Amino acid sequence: AYFDCRHSKRRTASAVFYEMDYESRLIALRDRINNRTYQTGKSVCFVVTRPRYREVFAASFEDRIVHHYIALRLTPLFEEIFSERTFNCRKGKGQLYGINTLKEDIRQCSNNYTEDCHIMKLDLKGFFMSIDKKLLSEMVDRFIVRYYKGEDIDDLRYLCRVVILHSPEKNCERHSPLSYWEKLDKNKSLFTNGEGKGVAIGNLFAQIFANFLLNTLDWFIENEGIKHHGRYVDDFY
């Protein structure tokens, strides 16, 4: 998990600092997990302005290690239940795969471009900010109990609860002008969204658990007999 985390962050100041004594720090992290005293650290919060204003949280380097630990164990299990029509954050899928799938769907529905066809584009409004963290935590925990066979199952269940139920807005540094938050709707920010609601955009686990949460929607669409459909995070057709 550490090396996966370091792979794309090695030149950052936080990664360099951690690497200076990474063995001791990883042992200390392991001990806190074993003792059930692990707590998420301070996040960095900022607002991106393009293509639209959006609040983003960046977890500390050590917390990212924990996220990778979770992803390494759950992603292979999630892959076994995901629809082939889910494109984001999956090996062999992604944006280009989704675009090509849509092109092929159009070709088939239009009888090789000889007939008109129609596309219904949808998205889940305020999806990440509307997630009930307690519900998500319970769903993930039930999934782990049912499908995960590793000896570290108790550690995995514990870390998932801590990560999902964490409220990063209560311990963060803002790196954007406060005026940027005034441009956000109240349901677009964890600071004003309401207790127990919302998952921070910007963290690895947010994308992974979003796919897990919406997997039910994907299979509902397929079970309704809709052959041509696809989803990328909370946008789908």
Regions picked out by a protein language model, each given a short descriptive name:
Residues 8-16, 41-65, 81-93, 167, ...:
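Short, conserved non-catalytic motifs in the polymerase core
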Residues 71-132:
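Active-site-proximal segment of RNA-dependent polymerases
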